[in-house]
Amino acid sequence: MTYIAHNHLAMRKFFYVGAIGLILFEALNVYFIMPMPGSQRSESIDLAYFLYHSRINFRALFILFMALGLIPNWRTHRWTTIILLGLSGLAYWASNYYMAADHMFYQPKSKAMAPAAENSIGQEKLVLGVVNGTEARAYPIQLIAYHHQVLDTVAGKVLMVTYCSVCRTGRVYEPSVDGKPETFRLVGMDHFNAMFEDSRTGSWWRQATGEAIAGDLKGKSIPEYPSRQMTLGQWLALYPGSRIFQPDTFFVDKYKGLARYDSGLGKSDLTRTDTSSWAEKSWVVGIVQNRKAKAYDWNRLKKERKIQDVVGGVPVLIVMGKDNMSFFAFKLPEDYEGFRMDGDSLRAGTVAWDLKGATPGNAPVLVPINAYQEFWHSWRTFHPGTARYE
């Protein structure tokens, strides 16, 4: 009898170990890749990746333990068994559905692109714009901040338009790895930045840099495609034939939650804006040239309207549009100094350029370069050697 009692107790312990282990595992599986207290400030990506990609093995082990002790525990502690089974199921559901990134933020079910005459987006709204050949397209940040990624084809080129509202990072990529087309899904975040998982290897890719940070492809990057951020009104002034991504009616309520995001009035502590300079959530404009990064204070750019500088040995010019939300960055030609803003034109002496960098005269064009508006904490984290323009 003593042996049977001890054996019965041991089997019951298997159930408790399995149930509690499964609950804790599901909690940790979410904790490291979602914005939980402390989770996004730790260097835990390798552990998070291991747990996530070992989830089938861990779940099988814990479920096996539960199965071994289920009947003995059911006979003597039925309500405890029911509660733990319910909590285990709830933890599994929350981890895989309720708190899974790709079940919280969906890609559009329908993708409508409208010309200016049929557009429903306000002229004051911020967009991420791309051009390929003669075709221009604009993607309102209010919309892509919810979706996190929108796949589109612009003049035959497949592009992945991405945005992370917690870092305020807009990037456009060609969804390919080593020249082969790839499919990505939103999987979570690391250091507050969205992460995507590729379909072939399950590697995790950072939205802000396009670099794989975990998995077989760690260290590789997907090609970035040039994009510019400005108000829709400014974009259409430069590209009147552009088509504009329209709201998907299925997600109208989701978009409403981001209605004031453009102006920095986020509804949560994750998306709010610091109005002072160089605080965690202050806006900066970041530039990278020749692998050298530099950040420029948004408040200073608004005040001075233009900043002429050298980054990585490259002379650059950053200017603010008259709407105080559109900004532009150019690589400068030699022998041109004294640039000034004249409405929405650039002038140096008697030469004038539009905000695409074109000039009707014989002067060299101003070559647009990628520049990014984002939170200071994001730029500093993903460009650890960055300089600051003082």
Residue ranges of model-derived segments:
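Short, Lys/Arg-rich, polar N-terminal cytosolic tail immediately upstream
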Residues: 1-7
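Mid-to-C-terminal functional-domain signal that highlights helix-capping/loop sites
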Residues: 7-390
